């Protein structure tokens, strides 16, 4: 199974644009924008990154560990480092939503580095993504817009506060 140790290598494999920051990437398609599509299919892979994404899958399944995620109504998905991901060409994405990806070392030396391991939504025990109401989706999109602004404008050490 292929494993990606850096965020850049993982995004390159997915055929997505490289990150603005070596340990953090933000892809946002809020409003009239479109999310870039990852490569069409993938055998099982792992990486050293966390991902938080809001996606809608028009058809097909994304396999995460032993679980198939249901994205038809739009849902937040949380992926932890070294979790197994796999998808095939049957997956068709709606190109709206967002994806925030960060290397586990991005959190090094922070309280969140210890706390994040307690969040069950990053583990296999969560059998499906977190489904959002339209109101919740708008609230999350607003937060992500602010994160994206910070990501695009501040690439120094203070960006770790994101």
Model region roles, listed by residue range:
Residues 1-63, 67-69:
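Generic protein-terminus/edge-of-domain signal
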Residues 46-49, 73, 94-96:
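A structure-centric signal for secondary-structure junctions around beta-strands
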Residues 66-80:
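Short acidic-glycine-tyrosine-enriched beta hairpin
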Residues 77, 82-87, 107:
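Histidine-centered metal-chelating micro-motifs
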Residues 153-162:
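All-alpha amphipathic helical-bundle segments outside canonical DNA-binding/catalytic cores
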Residues 45, 133-137, 159-160:
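Amphipathic, non-membrane alpha-helical segments in soluble helical-bundle scaffolds
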Residues 57, 81-83, 102-104:
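Residues immediately flanking
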Residues 13-16, 88-153:
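A hydrophobic/aromatic-rich effector-binding and dimerization subdomain
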